[in-house]
Structure formats: structure tokens, C-alpha cells
């Protein structure tokens, strides 16, 4: 359901943002 999708986004978004920030540093 949509709840599971939102849960995945909530947990995955911080990781994705951190990854993007690390990519910009290099």
C-alpha cells in the first residue's frame, strides 16, 4: 500500500541526500 511506499521514502531519502552531498564534495 501507499503506507509502505511512504515508509521507504522516509527511510531512504536521508541516505539519498547524504549520497548526493558526498558526490558534490568530490
Swiss-Prot record:
Main localization of the protein described in the UniProt heading: secreted
Gene Ontology annotations for the cellular component aspect, listed alphabetically: extracellular region; other organism cell membrane; pore complex
Residues bearing the modification N-formylglycine: 1
Gene Ontology biological-process annotations: killing of cells of another organism; monoatomic ion transport
Tissue localization of expression: Expressed by the venom gland.
Keyword Secreted: yes
Cell compartment(s), UniProt: Secreted; Target cell membrane
Residues bearing the modification Glutamine amide: 26
GO molecular function: porin activity; protein kinase inhibitor activity; toxin activity
Family matches, as Pfam families: Melittin
Keyword Oxidoreductase set for record: no
InterPro entries in UniProt: Melittin/Api_allergen
Disulfide bonds: none
Site positions (Important for the flexibility at the center of the helix, flexibility that is important for the stability of the voltage-gated pore): 14
Family listed: Belongs to the melittin family.
Oligomeric and partner information: Monomer (in solution and for integration into membranes), homotetramer (in solution and potentially as a toroidal pore in membranes), and potenially homomultimer (as a toroidal pore in membranes).
Protein role: Main toxin of bee venom with strong hemolytic activity and antimicrobial activity. It has enhancing effects on bee venom phospholipase A2 activity. This amphipathic toxin binds to negatively charged membrane surface and forms pore by inserting into lipid bilayers inducing the leakage of ions and molecules and the enhancement of permeability that ultimately leads to cell lysis. It acts as a voltage-gated pore with higher selectivity for anions over cations. The ion conductance has been shown to be voltage-dependent.
The protein, known as: Melittin
Organism: Apis florea (Dwarf honeybee)
